[in-house]
């Protein structure tokens, strides 16, 4: 992974494990995932300190990156492209494929003030290239499924729905709980009528690997539900549609079949503002998404200056677990050493050491 990231111009960094509660809560409804830290002498008195002022273990690598960029903005060259492979901690219930401590592999591009849309094509292609390297170890082919928050939001507002974040959170559950249950939740928690819920599910059914086909399907659905093209809602949706069509078409020109438009992709976190991605492996539907991310314009700022970004993240521990237990990957040697210098008896050890050192001197690390 690191080799592919660096070939594409990404710089490796490592950030501290501990962040302030205020930083960790930037991503929205994530408090249940955060492990807070206390000194032993403070146990029982933690409630005296607001969560925002306490320290906790980072649950992803995006929040630490946003803090890092703001702190070091004067020394960074923008757009800042970074890779990071590091442990994170999350309040999960341990089970197969779910860990409280695990390794993530992230790539992000951060701009200063603005960030061109073409990075929303570049990042999924880099990640697909990196995952392609793992096919030698039994990993199936990976495909990125992309959507755009503006497209979804514009469509929902065109239907007359106001709780857009709520709708996105429920649509994000579609693969887990099914269409009927999502429709029920949309009516009960988001104030949708049955017709509006049905329209949301119809949008989620749209997939395409061609920008023109995607636009035709979307416009037909808008027309069927009375969303007119001169409305503010359609204008917002069209911005997202144009970006998504560009991603699909440009990705197809470079690496056919690697990225498709899939309008059920929602990403429940509320800080995404544009493209959103989920990545699936062929023949491994039960595994779910193995790599996800999106565009965020408001996560990092310094005064009036914003640092928009786009990123993707692999849950590496979960992926390696799948490769070992399902895909048939295995260690091909018990030691990283490629040569064994045998020692037949202790009298021969000095000579063996000299031979080993001579061999090592020939290797350029």
Q: What residue spans do the PLM features occupy?
A:
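Positively charged, Gly/Ser-enriched RNA/tRNA-binding surfaces
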Residues: 1-8, 19-22, 30, 50-52, ...
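Amphipathic alpha-helical blocks
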Residues: 9-14
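Charged, often glycine-rich, active-site loop that binds/positions anionic groups
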Residues: 21-39
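Acidic, His- and aromatic-enriched active-site or binding-groove loops in soluble protein domains
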Residues: 33-47, 161-182, 281
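Conserved phosphate-binding loops in nucleotide/dinucleotide-binding enzymes
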Residues: 37-41, 47-57, 301
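Glycine-rich, mobile lid/loop segments that gate access to catalytic sites or pores
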Residues: 146-153
């Amino acid at each position: 992974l690191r080799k592919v990231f660096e070939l594409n111009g990404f710089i490796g960094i490592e950030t501290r494990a501990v962040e302030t509660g205020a930083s960790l809560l930037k991503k929205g409804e994530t408090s249940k995932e955060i492990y807070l830290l206390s000194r032993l002498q403070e146990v029982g008195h933690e409630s005296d300190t607001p969560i925002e002022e306490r320290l906790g273990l980072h649950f992803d690598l995006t929040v630490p990156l946003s803090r890092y960029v703001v702190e070091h903005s004067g020394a960074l060259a923008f757009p800042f492209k970074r890779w990071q492979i590091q442990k994170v901690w999350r309040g999960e219930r341990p089970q197969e494929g779910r860990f409280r401590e695990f390794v993530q592999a992230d790539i992000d591009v951060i701009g200063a003030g603005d960030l061109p849309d073409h990075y929303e094509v570049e990042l999924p292609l880099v990640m697909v290239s990196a995952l392609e390297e793992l096919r030698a170890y039994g990993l199936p082919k990976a495909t990125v499924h992309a959507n755009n928050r503006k497209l979804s939001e514009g469509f929902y507002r065109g239907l007359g729905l106001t709780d857009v974040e709520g709708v996105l959170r429920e649509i994000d559950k579609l693969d887990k709980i099914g269409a009927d249950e999502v429709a029920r939740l949309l009516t009960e928690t988001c104030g949708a009528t049955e017709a509006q819920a049905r329209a949301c599910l119809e949008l989620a059914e749209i997939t395409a690997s061609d920008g023109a086909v995607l636009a035709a399907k979307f416009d037909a659905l808008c027309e069927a539900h009375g969303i007119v093209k001169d409305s503010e809602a359609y204008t917002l949706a069209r911005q997202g549609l144009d970006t998504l069509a560009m991603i699909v078409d440009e990705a197809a020109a470079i690496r056919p079949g690697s990225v498709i438009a899939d309008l059920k992709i929602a990403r429940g976190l509320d800080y995404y503002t544009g493209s959103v991605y989920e990545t699936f492996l062929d023949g491994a539907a039960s595994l779910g998404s193995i790599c996800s991310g999106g565009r965020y314009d408001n996560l990092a700022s310094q005064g009036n200056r914003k640092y928009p970004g786009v990123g993707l993240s692999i849950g590496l521990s979960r992926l390696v677990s799948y490769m070992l237990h399902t895909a048939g990957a295995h260690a091909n040697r018990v030691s990283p050493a490629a040569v064994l210098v045998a020692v037949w008896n202790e009298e021969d050890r000095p000579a063996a050491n000299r031979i080993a050192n001579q061999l090592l001197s020939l290797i350029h690390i």
